[in-house]
Amino acid sequence: MVSPAQIAGHVFDPDDPGKRFVVELLIDGVPVGIARANLRNADLLRDEPNYRDGDFCHGFVFSIDPATHGVARQIEVRLANRGDVLAPPLLAPALDSGLAPLGGSANRDGAVRWLGGLRFNGWLAPAAGDESRIRALVDGQIVAEALASHWVQFGDCGETTRARGFDLSLPDHFADGRARQAQILDDHERELPGSPCAFVAFEDGLARFIDKHASLQRQTPRAKLFDRRAPQSLPFSMFAQWRDRFPDARLPPQDAPPPKVAVALIGERGIEASVASLEAQEVCDWVAAVLEGGGGETAFHNESLREFLDGDAKDCELVAFAPCGAVFQPTALAQLARALSRFPAAPGVYGDFTLAGEGGEWPVALSAFGYERMLEQGAGALLFALPTPVARAAVAGGAENLFRLFNFSQDGRPAPKAGPSSAPAATPVHQPGFLARLPRLDVAAATRALTEANRAHFSARRIRVEMAPGSGALFPAVRVRRPAPRGKVSVLIPTRDRVDLLEPCLEALFATADLALHEVIVLDNDSTDPETLAYFARLVQSGVRVIRVGGPFNFAKIINKGASIAVGHYLLLLNNDVEALEAGWLDEMLGRIAEPDVGAVGATLLWPGGVVQHGGVVLGPSFAAGHAFNERIDGDPGYADLLCATHEVSAVTAACLLTNRRLFLELGGFDSVHFPVNFNDVDYCLKLRAKGLRIVQSVHAKLLHRESASRGLDRRADQKDRFARELDHLRAIWGAVLCADPYYNPALSLDDFPFSALAWPPRPLQARQNVSPPPRPMPPGF
């Protein structure tokens, strides 16, 4: 018997009616409940032809958590400890609960779900006020509160709503390995759909818990998978507690101590705090100087640095740079030095840091090196170290601020006309871990300094660019415009019927981009709607190519067909539910792909309600791939100003993706076997990355995306099975990079909302360069 709230049944042995069985309930293969089948169930058992001479006490009942509805794929009941399935698995939609998962259209009274560990998130009804609060109760006691402080978008198929979202974490004393339930209430004492939520958390994750118990260590691989699927996290506001629990790693013993480090502090304020922290350095010898005269925290007189390098620092192998007022962690200099010793050919090393603020310290966890973010934000240039020969060369080249010192090593990058075969420039090393607390910047002064540094850098590369100040909140922001390269663009737009989407998509495309030299190809996947077919006829008369691609919906196959008949130098993949918002977006994307080492460019996509739908793809959340900044509204600077600066990512969505057609065909296009609908774009981008090419996410190309309005979300049983199968393929082929995205920091959480919390515990904070592993070959049929 099945209902939205319960699953009931009975189990007996015809040869031994007095025997009682224990059964367990599994959701998506994970045991979530256990019961003894001893309830009286006479009415049903009388109809069993094989039942006789018993007391009818063989029944069981399981209650179903409402949070399961719309999220679980299948539910089944088995004999405990034996694995015998009592009945065919139930598909969760058969429960007919009327609820939908986060992002669905049914939960208009709000929703909540457990993200893993002690973290929950969700939204309130759209009518909720700006100061609405959420409360969490465990065993009837209020244990946590949170303000609904950000935005989310829910709904699909063209009907979307913006609502207040919340993020809530329970106190850490609940991380004791015990399974519990939390009730989540709004400020009207109403329980949100999805509540109560079952949760379990461990002090340092399940894998570390098992490592402490010898009898359980055979379960370590499963525990690691659990930690990836249900990762634990801690809010940024609790950084002090996080650091106390996970202090920066002690330096491993080495035969030789690190070299003496010269430290150049830029500016005038806070020198006492900086010197005190240098005097507390462990292992590493140092000498320091304060460089003034340039104005602000990033500029200095060139001659003053030259004198320091020729004088007190002449015997140092390494020169570290930071704004005056930086407070270094005790092992900061040694960690920078040893990171460079691991990568002796690298031109420098930079580290993560915290920013001082009224609410304490706020962690800035950086990615591995990204050229675009260096240009538009100066990322890496506030806490870094250079080999002394590199520092001397930069000074000889006229460097007068931190940004020019840092970007000097990239002057040798190949010019756009050099072609993709040119050797790439060596890139700096990233040392994760928060090595220092930095003072807040004068953003306007830093933006001017970054502009000057970029001007010198592009002059050295002999590239003509235009630059304009951006609107950074914490860091400098400079928009860099490269000339759009010559070459035809083939715009590929798959569709099936839905003229209501396709027509505004094309109207916006023609209104915002000069397509006289380009071609537009509509890929028709078996449309039958008369209005759509009539529209196709009008498109053909206007010069648009309409190509029929028949058969079941296979996005990868459709795109591959379009690429095979396209004649453009570039391919622009564009969903039929995407609408351009303003002119210049295509030239922006073309300017980025002009660099010879760029393989693909993606745009920032917004839902109709103004919430960010796509800000790049992050690898690893829930051991999968997810969109960044889904909880941010347009105009929000994003974590560490990432929505203010174009930057690199491991992948971008094919809803709006620009790539070189020759590259696309060389790599075999999209994989239509393993990724017919989902993750084909991620797989393609990772193949580009494995070739040493960069994937750029532009914040200056913004388009509207009515996500899945055309084909709908994957909710049917067959669609969910397909999604699960494609996700299994992604994990099998690209598991190594899913565990270590170079554009994501090991100190950040891996739950479903990237850049929103700290990982508990952090992943290994090892020095790294920006490399991507090759795919793992997978035999057919696996």
Each model region followed by its residue ranges:
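A short, conserved alpha-helix in the catalytic core of glycosyltransferases
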Residues: 390, 398-434, 438, 585-589, ...
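Glycine-rich, basic loop-to-helix element that forms the pyrophosphate-binding segment
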Residues: 297-312, 549-566
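Short aromatic/hydrophobic "clamp" motif used to bind/position activated sugar donors
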Residues: 319, 571
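Conserved donor NDP-sugar-binding/catalytic core segment of glycosyltransferases
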Residues: 331-363, 426, 578-623
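Short, acidic, metal-binding catalytic loop of nucleotide-sugar glycosyltransferases
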Residues: 255-257, 275-285, 342, 507-517
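Non-catalytic membrane-proximal stalk/linker segments that position and tether the catalytic domains
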Residues: 91-107, 193-261, 266, 274, ...
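Basic, ligand-binding patches in group-transfer machinery
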Residues: 1-258, 280, 499, 503, ...
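A recurrent flexible, glycine/aromatic-enriched loop bordering the glycosyltransferase active site
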Residues: 362-391, 556-557, 564, 620-662
